[in-house]
Each structure stands twice: as C-alpha cells, then as structure tokens.
Amino acid sequence: MKLTNNKILITGGASGIGLAMAERFIQENNTVIICGRRDSALEEAKEKLPSVITKQCDLTLEADRSALFEWVAKEHSDLNVLVNNAGVQQWMNISDDDFFSKASQEIKTNIEVPLQLTWQFLKLPALDTILNVTSGLAFVPFTKVPVYSATKAFFHSFTLSLRELVKSKNIEVIEVIPPALNTDLGGIGLHDHAPPVSDFISAIFAQLEEGKVELTFGFTETVSQAGQEVFKPIFSRLNQG
C-alpha cells in the first residue's frame, strides 16, 4: 500500500484505533473521511483533526450503509482506500437474559457492516486497497467476549478469502490485527493497563512501509502465525485455479 496521496474512508473513525489511524494517515498527506454514529464524537475528532472529513451515519442500519456508499460514490468517487474498522465488544454470558440481543448487535456491527460495505465499495473504480481490522481474539477466543471473538474469527477468515477473490483486480487486502489496547472498547477502564494506541499505530505503519499484508503487534504476531506452516500450503492447494 502506498502511504501518501490516498483518499481513505475509515469506519468507526471518531475514536480509538480508527481516530489514531486517521491522524497518522493525515500526517502522511492523505485525505481522510471518517464516519460514525455520534455527532459529538465526530465534532471532537474534527476539532483535533481540522482537515478530516466527517460523515454521520448509523452503520447498524442497512439504509445508512447504502446511503454512505451513495454519498461517497457521488461526492468522493476517487476514494481508493476502505478501512473496515467499526466494531463493538460487549462482555456477556450465554445465560444472561440479554445475551441474544447483545450477540445480535455484535454480529450486525462486526460482520454485516463490513460485508455490505466491502461489497458496495468494490464497485468504486478507484478502489485499490481494503484494510480490515480484526483482532488477536480471532485466533484465541476470550470467553468473556465469546461472540466478539467469534465475529473476529469470521472476519479474519473472510479477509483471507477476499484477498484471493480480488487479486485479479489488483486490489490489495490488508489485515490489521490489534491486541488489547488502551481504548474504551468493551467498556471504560477495562484496558487502562494495555499498551497505548500510539505504539500500535507506529508499529503497523512501519509494517505497511515494508509491504506487509498482516499487521500485528505484541502477542498478535505470535498467535496469528501459529500453525501457518501447515495452514498456508493447504489454503493454497484448496484455492488454486
């Protein structure tokens, strides 16, 4: 992926990893659009990053996802990078009364949203790069967040297939695999002792400069590579031709 002179859309870009990525991409001389549900968060992001373009939308609504694509296709048809970053994580137990409602919300946000956006944004003639933000929990589930872990395992698997499916179109598919970081994902204060997002961003941008397509940090470097000497040749044989 070239690191400058792109036009980039980052979903969930008003906070956490998304906002940090937006800041770094802007520093690298890119035009960045962020979308999010809360106007207040978008306004705060705009105050921090005056050049960022903001778009309010509720990505859990199919109509809003389609409207976002239509707006980009009309107003920013030269957009060439999609970053599927939006996600939700909730602690839950299978015996909880609200388990299914929480699980449904995570499935919608973490699976349906990036699937639909990827399908639609592939129609943009300028699109040449997709970054999918998964998680180290895609490889080793954390039982406090069982559905989140499963959705990220799905998204990791889909990303592998997507990379092969769009190879002939010269579209690069990059997987961003964060560990727990000092953000409010899952709840305020849960990750106060985790590494800062800034360290993660520095690491993955160094890997982007090296041309890597799986961007890892800390323990995710280990878990994402476990068993790859067995997996990769089987994956290649299964999907050749």
Positions of predicted regions on the chain:
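C-terminal helical subdomain
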Residues: 175, 183, 187-229
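Conserved glycine-rich cofactor-binding loop
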Residues: 7, 12-16
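Conserved mid-core segment of classical short-chain dehydrogenase/reductases
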Residues: 66, 89-104, 144-147
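Residue(s) in the substrate-gating loop at a strand-loop-helix junction
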Residues: 135
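Catalytic Tyr-X3-Lys loop
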Residues: 88, 99-116, 131, 155
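The beta1-alpha1 cofactor-binding region of Rossmann-like NAD(H)/NADP(H)-dependent oxidoreductases
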Residues: 56-68
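Active-site helix of classical SDR
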Residues: 118, 151
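Rossmann-fold scaffold of SDR-type NAD(P)-dependent oxidoreductases
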Residues: 11, 79-87, 110, 132
